[in-house]
Amino acid sequence: MQMMSLRSLVIMFLVVALSAGSVLAKQQFGRPLTLAVVTKVSEIEKNPRDFVGKKVLIRGTVVEVCAKRGCWLDIASDTPYGKFQAKVVDGVIVFPMSARGKVARVEGIVEELKLSREEALAYHRHHAEEKGLPFDPATVKGPETFYRLQAQGAELE
């Protein structure tokens, strides 16, 4: 009888341990992460051209997710009010809205986007529509250049 109780106790312990492990598991998106060293978002923000074309791993809290296709994440910087966008090819990786507020590690290539005024208008109009916000074309003064991470893989902690 005592052997049966011990066996039952061990089985219950294993079930609980395995269940807890699956709940605590990281969510993986896209390719597995290969870099070990995290590059601070603030370093990229400070000198973005130094990082263009380079593979980096960033880490931070997800502050926004594309509501239409889950095709990008905005990752909070390690400095106040800063953020950096991680974009994926539409449909290749789909980030869930539940990623907001979680810590993400995202790996990819830093890219520079140079937009003409017309492209910048279309870009900002599209983002306003995604967020359900009004768009004033007068806010776009001319061509724009910005930087983002072309994400290849990510983990939500």
Residue ranges of model-derived segments:
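N-terminal secretory signal peptides that target proteins for export/translocation
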Residues: 1-6
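Bacterial N-terminal signal peptides
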Residues: 9-20
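OB-fold and OB-like single-stranded nucleic-acid-recognition modules
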Residues: 24-157
